[in-house]
Amino acid sequence: MDYRKSHLHPDKGESYSALFTNNPYRNMVWQFEKSFLDSILTLFYRNSDIHHLDFACGTGRILSYLEDRTKSSTGVDLSPVMLEVARKNIKRADIIEEDLTQNDVLGDRKFNLITAFRFFPNAEAELRMQAMHVLSRHLEENGYIVFNNHLNTGSTINRLIKFVGRRGFKGMSIAEVKNLLSKNHLEIVKVFHICVLPASEDRMIFPLSLLRHVERFLAGIPVLRNLALNLVFVCKHECS
């Protein structure tokens, strides 16, 4: 199935948005992702005006979290049902319904913060490349692209799935992430990680309070990064 068509069902927007509140594991991950975003703003944008583009913004989760700390915020998505929910969640961000990989309506606009969450590992390889090409073109010289790979194929849970003889899930390997960035002349400057333990949205092997505590500890150990299910990459243009 073309990933472009995956979020067009009339009920998709509300049901997708509810997962981040109603599913304990996904909600836990979202709390960690918010803390990562806080750290990124502190590390890279202290005393700077932020002009933010959220690509594949969906229901506006990232936009609504960041918009009070940005000079300008723009969200782009091709799904009208997702954007219907986004418009309820945001206060002042601009919303554009478009597929930038096929019709780049942003023209020559530049942004110093571009985010793209829960998009790249779900998208087909060709779509990934098209999307990153567009985003790199709209990134200011000293700006950063922040995106996540929430389906790291080298994660602990995927390794265990394969170990017991089942087919692992589709997603992206870290090597694929690096290749995608290299081909678009981008380099990684910071990586955050979470979800090292083999838990999932459907099966929690530990009580949530314990899982949260342990994952917070494991998130501070860089050597475990390759085993994490969810990695957040901070990237910039390659130095010439």
Regions found by a protein language model. Give the residues of each.
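Short, glycine-/aromatic-enriched active-site segment of Class I SAM-dependent methyltransferases
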Residues: 150-168
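Conserved beta-strand signature within the Rossmann-like core of class I S-adenosyl-L-methionine
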Residues: 142-149
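Class I SAM-dependent methyltransferase SAM/SAH-binding core
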Residues: 59-102
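A short glycine-rich, Lys/Arg-flanked "PGG" loop and its adjoining helix->strand segment in the class I
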Residues: 129-141
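A C-terminal cap/extension of S-adenosyl-L-methionine-dependent methyltransferases
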Residues: 190-240
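A conserved beta-strand element that flanks and buttresses the S-adenosyl-L-methionine
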Residues: 115
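Conserved class I S-adenosyl-L-methionine
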Residues: 1-45, 48-56
